[in-house]
């Protein structure tokens, strides 16, 4: 989750989010390099009192400033297309959960395990424990095993919502009358927080999501208590 004074993106907890982080870092360096080069060229021409007569008409320079951006865009686009493919790639998931967005809480269904169902509401500030997170904790956490491919089926019962967990690189629109899906794999244990990412009314800011990544044994024990 995002922590105090952290100005960067969250640490990835899934292979997909790690790839997105690498993509962000690489292309941030490209953007900084372009900014420095263009800024230096503009400053040099602005404060230079001399005129190069050979530069008054487009010759070699026009070819250069057309070819270099084109090559740069190609190197940026290729990793981006690969990530877009991975984001939409659908694999054979071992566990499927259903999330239904409602005003203003989430409903979950584990239909693979005798229809385990529950609702999650934000924990009020007066009910938080000492180690709780304000506006992020819920009364029922969503427990999932790590190192397991999980498929999320998302819909809504009233208005548009969006099920988003940044640390997992997942953002799925919840649309009434439609069923959207996404997949992810958590590669480490922990608590991963998210929120509704589509403005859905007065209490839009109070629809947190909490995913608890555990071992398979602890997940089975939790399921046995829920059934």
Swiss-Prot record:
Enzyme Commission number, as recorded: 7.1.1.9
Source species of the chain: Schistocerca gregaria
Cited SUPFAM superfamilies: Cupredoxins, Cytochrome c oxidase subunit II-like, transmembrane region
Descriptive protein name: Cytochrome c oxidase subunit 2
UniProt function note: Component of the cytochrome c oxidase, the last enzyme in the mitochondrial electron transport chain which drives oxidative phosphorylation. The respiratory chain contains 3 multisubunit complexes succinate dehydrogenase (complex II, CII), ubiquinol-cytochrome c oxidoreductase (cytochrome b-c1 complex, complex III, CIII) and cytochrome c oxidase (complex IV, CIV), that cooperate to transfer electrons derived from NADH and succinate to molecular oxygen, creating an electrochemical gradient over the inner membrane that drives transmembrane transport and the ATP synthase.
PANTHER family linked: CYTOCHROME C OXIDASE SUBUNIT 2, CYTOCHROME C OXIDASE, SUBUNIT II
A GO cellular-component term linked to this record: mitochondrial inner membrane
Keywords: Copper, Electron transport, Magnesium, Membrane, Metal-binding, Mitochondrion, Mitochondrion inner membrane, Respiratory chain, Translocase, Transmembrane, Transmembrane helix, Transport
């Amino acid at each position: 989750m995002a922590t105090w004074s952290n100005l960067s993106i969250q640490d990835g907890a899934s292979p997909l989010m790690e790839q997105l982080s690498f993509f962000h870092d690489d292309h941030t360096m490209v953007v900084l390099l372009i900014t420095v080069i263009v800024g230096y060229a503009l400053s040099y021409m602005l404060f230079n009192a001399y005129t190069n007569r050979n530069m008054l008409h487009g010759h070699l320079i026009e070819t250069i400033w057309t070819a270099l951006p084109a090559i740069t865009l190609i190197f940026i686009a290729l990793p981006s297309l690969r990530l877009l493919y991975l984001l939409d790639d659908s694999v054979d998931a071992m566990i499927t959960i259903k999330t239904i967005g409602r005003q203003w809480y989430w409903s979950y269904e584990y239909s693979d395990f005798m229809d385990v169902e529950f609702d999650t509401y934000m924990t009020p500030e007066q009910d938080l424990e000492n180690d709780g997170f304000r506006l992020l904790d819920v009364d029922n956490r969503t427990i999932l095993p790590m190192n397991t491919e999980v498929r999320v089926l998302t819909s809504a019962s009233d208005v548009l919502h969006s099920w988003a967990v940044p640390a997992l690189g997942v953002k799925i629109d919840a649309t009434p009358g439609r069923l959207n899906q996404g997949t992810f794999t958590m590669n480490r244990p922990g608590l991963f927080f998210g929120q509704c990412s589509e403005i859905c009314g007065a209490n839009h800011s109070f629809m947190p999501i909490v995913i608890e990544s555990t071992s398979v044994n602890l997940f089975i024990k939790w399921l046995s208590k829920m059934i």
